[in-house]
Design a protein with these regions (language model features):
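Flexible inter-repeat linkers and adjacent short helices
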Residues: 1-52, 57-63, 249-251
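Short coil/turn linkers that connect adjacent helices within long alpha-helical scaffolds
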Residues: 1-2, 40-43, 80-84, 122-126, ...
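Amphipathic alpha-helical segments of tetratricopeptide repeats
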Residues: 32-37, 75-80, 114-124, 157-164, ...
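TPR-repeat structural position
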Residues: 24, 44, 64, 71, ...
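TPR/TPR-like (Sel1-like) alpha-helical repeat modules
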Residues: 156, 196-203, 227-250
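Conserved alpha-helical positions within TPR/SEL1-like repeat arrays
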Residues: 12-22, 46-60, 87-102, 129-144, ...
Length: 251
């Protein structure tokens, strides 16, 4: 470790190891340790990286106060470090927007998504995985607000980008599953279209065109309840079983 900086690569490697094992206790301890180290060293950039991971972790753990506290400090650091017009800042905005939307503050979230989108458009980076992730997350917020046409447009654009980029079949599957929900919410008689979207999502979930790591296990667990919701319990259980096997392989 440098005298005044945390080793970000080591932090990410260790945190990824916790997620690959699906060990949330170790993940929390890892985040807390590196956050304390960054604060001790006065390493604002390192702290921003750790806090950004903390935002996502506490959101997934449904720890609202911790997630929002980490989010607010992250946004303050973006201002302090002069990153408001940068792609690094856009990454923070997307995570913050997703968190606000998750906790019912969708309109605030949309403003941050739009701010992040401006960074990618200005940098001519709208055919990237990162921009597709923005579109996916913004679509979810638009869907919550029942702005179905806009949500559908965002998800479809994200899918097309991810297909071009390659190696993100899990994320494509999530988008297709969410489109199935949107289709059903907009018209609950659209059974054939819903089934077609789920069939396509299932194919992407079982594709070999993705790493079988902790993120893959997370994708499977994220999609499983939707297959159950649409009366496909055997597929839902299969997704959970494979997710468990992936995590166990890292232990």
């Amino acid at each position: 470790m440098d005298n005044d900086r945390i080793n970000i690569a080591r932090f990410i490697e260790r945190l990824d190891g916790c997620f690959n094992r699906n060990n949330m206790k170790e993940a929390r301890e890892c985040i807390e340790y590196w956050e304390n180290e960054a604060r001790r060293l006065g390493d604002d950039r390192g702290l921003l990286t750790v806090l950004n991971e903390a935002v996502g972790f506490y959101r997934r753990s449904q720890k609202k106060s911790r997630a929002l506290r980490a989010m607010e400090e992250s946004l303050s650091l973006v201002e302090k470090l002069g990153l408001t017009q940068s792609l690094s800042g856009a990454t923070i905005y997307i995570n913050a927007a997703t968190t606000l939307s998750f906790f019912g503050r969708e309109e605030e979230g949309l403003r941050l998504y739009d701010k992040a989108a401006e960074c990618y458009i200005r940098s001519d980076l709208t055919e990237t995985y990162e921009y597709a992730a923005l579109l996916n997350n913004r679509a979810g917020t638009l869907n919550e607000l029942k702005r179905y046409d806009e949500a559908e447009e965002n998800w479809n654009e994200a899918i097309e980008i991810l297909k071009k980029v390659g190696y993100h079949d899990g994320e494509i599957a999530i988008s297709l599953v969410m489109l199935a929900h949107l289709t059903f919410d907009r018209d609950n008689t659209s059974y054939e279209k819903v089934e077609a979207l789920l069939d396509e999502a299932w194919a992407y979930l079982n594709s070999d065109n993705q790493a079988k790591d902790g993120n893959y296990a997370y994708v499977l667990r994220k999609c499983a309840p939707s297959f159950e919701y649409f009366q496909r319990p055997m597929e839902a259980q299969a997704l959970r079983d494979v997710a468990r096997e992936v995590n166990e392989a890292y232990r």
